[in-house]
């Protein structure tokens, strides 16, 4: 029997590699994908959160920034597209093309207004009673979006000189009261929320007399509006109302769908209209 030379061993090894590679390619082509391979992510993906002034091809351009505290402080900005030109048309998002928020870093100041377009610039004004560190957010839905439920949110920090009385963020609790005397109680369980898990948050609204509201007046084309802000990161989270506009509220309860992308505490601001007035209730929730 002839002994195998070094060359024979090399040719044998090459042949084995060719056979194995061919088998892998054959099975890779012929084996259908499994059910798990076709499945998407098991948890919702995070969305635009206002931590950047540029995202998804859009950029926030400062035109007029708040310079002093006071009432009716002017703000103006442009939204630039990928080509660097101002974008002046967006889809309606709860009846408005542009939502604009301002929060102070202790969550004691919250403003939600709707800028108007002047040429290529969005103009508005906000009440800023105290100095301190703030963040502003521009929220809009591009005309060509493939995900109309999740707007683009661009955020820009700013600060105001002057006396600042920092207010500790309230601990998570079930009940809140508006400045107009309404009580709002969170009734869903458990109290602590899971990160990147969709949840429905339910809020029972009572009049100053303690009577459950039977229905709410339209506010931004819905029963209410809710936005959350991470108390440390100052990121924004958009929550979606569940009950259709005009439907009676069972026991005065209003429901929102929410997904929170980060662990920590969030401050939620619920806005609703009743008896011709806008009411705002704030809640702190914990996410783990």
For the regions a protein language model found, what residue spans apply to each?
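Intrinsically disordered, low-complexity terminal tails/loops enriched in metal-binding residues
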Residues: 1-288
